[in-house]
Amino acid sequence: QWRDRIRRVQFDDAIPKPESLEGQIAYRGYETAERNAIMKGLHDAQDDDVVAIFDADEIPSQETTQTLRKGLTELTRLHFQMHYYTFNHVIDWPWTLPVAIPFRLLKETTPNKIRHWAARYHHVIEKAGWHLGFFGDNQTIRKKLACYAEFWLNDPKFTTDENLNQARIEGRDFASREYGG
């Protein structure tokens, strides 16, 4: 039912994998350029159309989708429940990067700025969906980290089977990062 409303934007810009802090900055720039390429798929968007800016592992609930379909008048921040490794492992703080915005406001800026640098949240939808972080087996996690913008996480001290398995057992982040609201 949605096939005619989904657009695939080919992003061919290439950037080498970072090997240094300067490289990480360049890699973050690639991630930014990739997200901003969303605009290429919106060439015929109408001012009142709602644009949702989510990563592939950020899944809105059916209720949130229905709310967004009714339209928005302002930038809306979506608080997703954070899950690590499996759906049963809940991290006790909201994931707050997903946003939805009317196209008329988006075209004044960029998708990446809206996602990361928007001034205080204008409107918030709580319990809007799920962020499924680092799902999959250890090899899948390592593949993700190999192309991750935070390339410092792709370090053997974090990516060994022993560390990844222990992190699952202990219910902690594999890099022992502390989370909070």
Question: Can you say where each PLM-predicted feature lies in the sequence?
Answer:
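SAM cofactor-binding core of SAM-dependent methyltransferases
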Residues: 1
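Catalytic-site signature of metal-activated, phosphate-bearing donor transferases
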Residues: 4-11, 18-44, 59-181
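Short aromatic/hydrophobic "clamp" motif used to bind/position activated sugar donors
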Residues: 51
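Active-site acidic Asp-centered loop
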Residues: 54-55
